[in-house]
Amino acid sequence: MKYQWKDNKKFAFTIVDDTDGASVETIQPVYDCLYKNGIITTKTVWMKPPRDYFPGDSMEHAAYRDYVLQLQRQGFEIAFHDIGSGV
């Protein structure tokens, strides 16, 4: 069975962002650049705050959640990383 890529493309390339260490301050410049250049990726998120040594915001943090939802509206795929780091 041969897979037919969209628009008869020869291959697909994907980028998935690991959410460890993510905050609006650390990811916004990256996602602004990606969006400006037409590169749409997958952003992973934690639902709960980390409970170990990994820093980063979760969907319980209002500003982060709002930004992630903005990314989704821009076409970025939002994926469940885990309930939270160390949970």
Explain the meaning of each model-derived region.
Residues M1-V87:
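Catalytic alpha-helical scaffold of carbohydrate-active enzymes acting on polysaccharides/glycoconjugates
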